[in-house]
């Protein structure tokens, strides 16, 4: 039986999802680390990792801030926290603290931290307002909040277009909304950050177009396979519809002229005033 905090995860917390999140982190890691370096995260910083998951970004942040810095990872899945703690133990990281908490139910309080990192979390929570307020309150004046959140999930698209994969993307978005999330939440973040006493410093769109020969093609591949099964469980796809999605993806994967555009997200950097 899943732990109470794991049962309602939209994408699940099983081993396959842990592995998929690792692949996802590797695909986007160059973009992420470039962002962290650009905003100045370095030795001695105290960083908050929101929705730390299995700890992929947490461990990278801990290595960047070094032994004189620290990382606080917040995650509500006991399963993910188990994996994250083991990851940090294997990498010899002693500057990481994890807390099992649901940010929709608790307040972090005034922690005086230097920066926060939030990737693909705001799109799943029931109250982005509360999430942003929690983050703002945890930062020191001048502290930075960094977000990678979807703004145009509709750009999830294969070329040539394939009808079952188009419907799959629509059902993914609908499943998030059915649990209180919003796939295009980044559109609202600048206003929410302003209302929480933060100043937006920069916004950058992040989107890629990849072919089957590209490493990043594995990202939609793993996402589709796992989420077809998840959408079947939720009753959003029949077995026949799920099989057609997988058939269309196999056809795209075998076609060297196929292309995939990733769902666009925004890289938002804001500063607490």
What residue spans do the PLM features occupy?
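A short glycine-rich, Lys/Arg-flanked "PGG" loop and its adjoining helix->strand segment in the class I
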Residues: 129-144
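Class I SAM-dependent methyltransferase SAM/SAH-binding core
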Residues: 48, 54-106
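Conserved catalytic/acceptor-binding region of the Class I
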Residues: 146-214
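A short acidic, Gly/Pro-enriched loop at the edge of an enzyme's catalytic core
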Residues: 107-115
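A short SAM/SAH-binding and catalytic strip from SAM-dependent methyltransferases
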Residues: 114-129
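Conserved alpha-helix/loop element of class I SAM-dependent methyltransferases that forms part
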Residues: 26-45, 60
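Conserved Class I S-adenosyl-L-methionine
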Residues: 183-184, 201-273
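N-terminal, positively charged/glycine-rich alpha-helical extensions of SAM-dependent methyltransferases
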Residues: 1-18, 22-23
């Amino acid at each position: 039986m899943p732990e109470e905090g794991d049962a309602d995860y939209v994408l699940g917390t099983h081993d396959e999802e842990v592995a998929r999140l690792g692949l996802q982190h590797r695909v986007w890691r160059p973009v992420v680390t470039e962002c962290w370096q650009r905003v100045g995260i370095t030795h001695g910083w105290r960083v908050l990792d929101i929705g730390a998951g299995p700890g992929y970004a947490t461990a990278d942040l801990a290595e960047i801030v070094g032994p004189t810095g620290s990382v606080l990872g917040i995650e509500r899945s006991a399963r993910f926290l188990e994996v994250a703690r083991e990851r940090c133990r294997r990498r010899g990281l002693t500057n990481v603290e994890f807390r099992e908490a649901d940010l929709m139910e608790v307040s972090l309080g005034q922690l005086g931290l230097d920066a926060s990192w939030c990737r693909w979390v705001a799109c799943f929570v029931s109250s982005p307002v509360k999430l942003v307020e929690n983050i703002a309150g945890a930062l020191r004046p001048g502290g930075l909040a960094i977000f990678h959140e979807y703004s145009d999930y509709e750009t999830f698209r294969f070329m040539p277009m394939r009808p079952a994969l188009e419907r799959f993307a629509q059902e993914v978005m609908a499943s998030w909304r059915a649990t209180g999330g919003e796939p295009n939440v980044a559109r609202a973040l600048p206003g929410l950050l302003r209302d929480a006493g933060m100043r937006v410093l920069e916004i950058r769109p992040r989107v890629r177009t990849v072919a089957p020969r590209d490493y990043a093609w594995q990202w939609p591949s793993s996402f589709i396979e796992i989420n077809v099964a998840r959408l079947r469980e939720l009753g959003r796809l029949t077995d026949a519809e799920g099989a057609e999605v997988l058939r269309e993806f196999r056809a795209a994967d075998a076609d060297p002229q196929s292309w995939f555009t990733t769902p666009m997200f925004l890289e938002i950097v804001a500063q607490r005033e």
